[in-house]
Amino acid sequence: MNEIVTKCPAKINLNLRILDKREDGYHNIQTDYQLIDIYDHLKFKSNKDRNITIESKETYLNDEFNTIYQSAEKLQKLMNENAGVVIEVKKNIPTGSGLGGASSNAASTLVALNKLWRLNLNKHDLIKIASSIGADVPFFVYGKNASGQGIGAVSYTHLTLPTKDS
């Protein structure tokens, strides 16, 4: 397997209860997350040069400070062999909109490279890595509508939402 293509969904917070402020600057919250049908598209192509290259029309993605690069770098450090990747990014989720585009991209990168590089990390391990990247990244690794508390990444329980028919 040399290539993986992913769709990175956006999310909305159905409700958001802001609680107390923590010593680390974050606020404790309670929220319900809903995945929505707006997607960024990422294509991962492995190579053996240990370079992480991001290709996008969005120039702000072409540096080492974005969540896609951070996610790839964290997994690359777990590799015993040369592993590089070219990541093509097509953005559809509006930047800075609160829809979780950067977090979704980070989570998709973790999941895709775990498979592409055959790291065999389980979901719990990926969520642990995700929490070091951003507060919403674990939700996207979890991949289902969920309730969150703490800074949003502390615990997730599956949230069942009513359908149009119920």
List each language-model region with its residue ranges.
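ATP-binding N-lobe of GHMP and related small-molecule kinases
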Residues: M1-S97, K115, L119-H124
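Glycine-rich, charged/polar anion/phosphate-binding loops
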Residues: H27-I29, G150-Y156
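Short glycine/proline-enriched turns and hinge-like loops at secondary-structure junctions
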Residues: G25, V141-Y142, L159
